[in-house]
């Protein structure tokens, strides 16, 4: 008799808080505008995402702490390559009364479930997303001293960028007594 024990590495993340499910959706809405694909590093402290725009000008990083999720389970650190546009389309199917569950076993496929909150009725939507192999190494993000600190709500910044992107792909931010956002492109 041959006895084989397979170790299935699993990860399950759940968001049930309405505000957090909306924030999670906005994260991928904005990521898809910066990068085509990202690699999620799932570890005991949370999820870490680092990426770069196609022109290799903008390096970004994002960390969602484990305690930010309503449920955070994982067996071992995982690296999940995700296509930003596709995950955004899936999460965008979420209705206001739905929770989000992300789950994978052995990092082969990402299962996204959008299901009604407790006490709510509705349809459960299940999606299976093929993960992609991203051959990248984490870059060291240097500490930088900035001449100006700007605090703005992420939704306000997203709205500004969306509105200015209508006029072109360039965005300049001028800091002085006032902060000025200027969008420009081929037409002006």
What do these predicted regions represent?
Residues 2-32, 38-166, 172-188:
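DNA polymerase sliding clamps and clamp-related checkpoint/processivity subunits
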């Amino acid at each position: 008799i041959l006895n084989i024990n397979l170790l299935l590495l699993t990860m399950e993340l759940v968001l049930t808080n309405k505000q957090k499910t909306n924030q999670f959706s906005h994260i991928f809405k904005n990521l898809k505008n910066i990068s085509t694909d990202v690699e999620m590093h799932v570890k005991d402290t949370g999820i870490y995402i680092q990426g770069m725009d196609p022109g290799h000008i903008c390096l970004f990083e994002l960390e969602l702490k484990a305690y930010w999720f309503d449920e955070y389970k994982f067996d071992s650190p995982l690296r999940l390559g995700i296509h930003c546009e596709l995950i955004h389309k899936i999460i965008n199917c979420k209705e206001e009364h739905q929770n989000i569950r992300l789950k994978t076993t052995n990092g082969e496929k990402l299962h996204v479930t959008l299901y009604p909150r407790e006490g709510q009725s509705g349809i459960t939507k299940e999606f299976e997303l093929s993960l992609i192999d991203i051959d990248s190494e984490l870059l060291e993000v240097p500490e930088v001293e900035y001449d100006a600190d700007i605090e703005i709500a992420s939704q306000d910044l997203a709205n500004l960028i969306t509105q200015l992107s209508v006029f072109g792909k360039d965005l300049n931010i001028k800091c002085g007594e006032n902060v000025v956002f200027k969008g420009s492109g081929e037409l002006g």
